[in-house]
């Protein structure tokens, strides 16, 4: 399985082409639209999300609600493009129109300046448009297809926010996977403690009035993955490493950890290793899950626990100092449309990116020309692991 995305933030549309999806997977536009709508939600989103109503168009690879095994083409129209027809025109335009929305004051924390240097851009909009988080629309769309595969194999997942700006979410003890999932899904903030909703919303409103932004830490949990996905035989086959690369590729993500993560640097080995158990009904298990479901780059059969840290959005309505790329004089950075926080949306993106990596690993590990073939191979492997 592989995919490419294309499109600019204010261009006509966004596109993804996915190759390697088995034939016979039930797939409807509504499956993808559901995830796209989740990405657009969450408290603290800005004006752009009130303009766009993301809906996918499937133009290949699906017929009568079933995948055919051919490449799948997904497209999402950018409604806002109608206001940018001159600025984002494909053909040449008058010089005065080119200057209309030219970006020459790069924003600290964005790809503007370095992208302009690398690709020799006189107008930093050429970097800004593609590096925008709008691209993640299509990674969510691809992830929605991946989640359909995982669902057919009995794999489920959730995400929730652990830290919202400077506020740590208190996680009620002994919540099941399903309870965590339901609480996060029904929260505008993707948190599992409803008692903290108003406190955080008030904080977001304050940050917005100040023209500032906040980041935080997101946790994704995956249930139902058997032991043995990934490999220790080469560095680039380790599944946790693949997940780390994918999570860090999400806009504004600056760190990733698994299970207890960086806290393990302060503990002894006897405190963090997950002792092995075995029962006739369940097979192998673990007393704990400090390692987040991974050993040696392979899944252990425990829930996968992946955490990502998102920096505050770098576009500020109270802009920081920058430099004019023409005169090299100090200037306030360019202001583009932005949100005080996009943590709930980033959680949806992270969840779908993780789903894509897992689906790809499964499709490369098991016979997968058709879904029925994949389901049988996966079921047989589960049975093997249980009796090992």
Curated annotation (Swiss-Prot):
Under the cellular component aspect of Gene Ontology, which terms does the record hold? cytosol
The record's cofactor note says: Reduced FMN (FMNH(2)).
Q: How does it assemble?
A: Homotetramer.
Which cofactors are required for activity?
Answer: FMNH2
**Which EC number(s) does the record attach to this protein?**
4.2.3.5
Q: Which SUPFAM superfamilies match?
A: Chorismate synthase, AroC
Name of encoding gene? aroC
- List the Gene Ontology MF annotations in alphabetical order: chorismate synthase activity; FMN binding
Instruction: Note the InterPro entries from the entry.
Output: Chorismate_synth, Chorismate_synth_AroC_sf, Chorismate_synthase_CS
Q: What does the UniProt record say this protein does?
A: This reaction introduces a second double bond into the aromatic ring system.
Q: What is this protein called?
A: Chorismate synthase
Q: Does the keyword Repeat apply?
A: no
Q: Which reaction does this enzyme catalyse, per its entry?
A: 5-O-(1-carboxyvinyl)-3-phosphoshikimate = chorismate + phosphate
Describe the family membership recorded for this protein in Swiss-Prot or TrEMBL.
Belongs to the chorismate synthase family.
**The protein's annotated pathway:** Metabolic intermediate biosynthesis; chorismate biosynthesis; chorismate from D-erythrose 4-phosphate and phosphoenolpyruvate: step 7/7
Q: Which HAMAP family match?
A: Chorismate_synth
Q: Which superkingdom heads the taxonomic lineage of this protein's source?
A: Bacteria
What are the recorded Gene Ontology BP terms?
Answer: amino acid biosynthetic process; aromatic amino acid family biosynthetic process; chorismate biosynthetic process
Positions that bind FMN? 130-132, 251-252, 296, 311-315, 337
Q: Which UniProt keywords apply?
A: Amino-acid biosynthesis, Aromatic amino acid biosynthesis, FAD, Flavoprotein, FMN, Lyase, NADP
Q: Which residues bind NADP(+)?
A: 39, 45
